[in-house]
Amino acid sequence: MTETKNSKMLDEGGKSVVALMAALMAAIFAFQLNASMLSPALTTMRVELNTTDAQIGLTQMVFFTSCAVFSLFLPRLGDLIGRKKVLLGILVLTALGCVVSALAVNVPMLMIGRVIQGVAGPIVPMTLIMLHAKVTEDKKYAKLMAILTSVNGGIGGVDAILGGWLAGTFGFRSVFWVMVGVAVLAIVLVFVYAEESTASETPKMDWVGVVSLAAAFLAAYLAINEIQKLGSANWALVAVEIVIAAVLFVVFWNVEKRQKAPMVTTHYLKQRRTWGLLLTTLLTMTGVFAIMNGIVPALAQDTEVGAGMSASVVSFATLTPYALIGLAFGPVAG
């Protein structure tokens, strides 16, 4: 009797789970296109905006910085006030940022658009939390989670190929307009098919912890960005930023110890296994993304020291292979 009842519940929920998966995958697409679709278009952006590679690289930096900062607190905010509500807000702002970037007439305007687009940073973890609120069976959740995360490293290379073709044929602005379309589609699907959910307990948001941690992270990030200039780096500025980051992290730690509902429990931050997982993920993704989505495409398009490939060709030759591997092995890992 119990087995029949469980099967019936799974069957009745089947259609809603499929619809939810479609909505969540569309949301992940909206983020992923912002992260990977521009890689083959960076050279085109430099030419059309009449700027330098360094300036275009800076627009990428501000996007990922923005992603990281928003990822620190938006998932927690979703737990407290509603994950669907927060995800819809993220997607609306992402679409707005894409519009600003598409209309950009210079690098500063493009940077503003990319900062706004960075709100999409926490989309992947938020979709996984929303999926788990719907699918609580571990085995089934692991399979569905793997499907969602398998597209996070690149949509089978299609995003890179399409980005290169659009940039080479219609200019870099067309890439952003496609992002707008995908974000709007995701908004509609999430609004219709996703269900609202929150954490079991919903205390007030720890905004003091949010601000102190975000500021500490930003100071450390700026220090790292300055260090990469090597010979031309302002080492006094680096030292100041590192000190500021350390002080703000101490402030964050003490705030969290006193909070009844902290954003991050310091008990977990003291555990070696926490940092092992975080550092492994950070270092791996930093290396892979910097090489495969930055250095390799730029070198392949360089006409002086590289292969001199077009944007459309470099997408297929450098970005598609590893995206296909990720798409194939994500479900296998799950």
Indicate residue ranges for each PLM-predicted region:
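Cytosolic juxtamembrane N-terminal segment immediately preceding the first transmembrane helix
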Residues: 1-33, 47, 259
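Helix-breaking motifs and short loop linkers at transmembrane-helix boundaries and internal kinks
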Residues: 48-50, 82, 103-109, 171
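Conserved MFS/SLC helix-loop-helix module at the cytosolic interface between two early adjacent transmembrane helices
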Residues: 69-105
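Hydrophobic transmembrane-helix bundles of small-molecule transporters
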Residues: 168-280
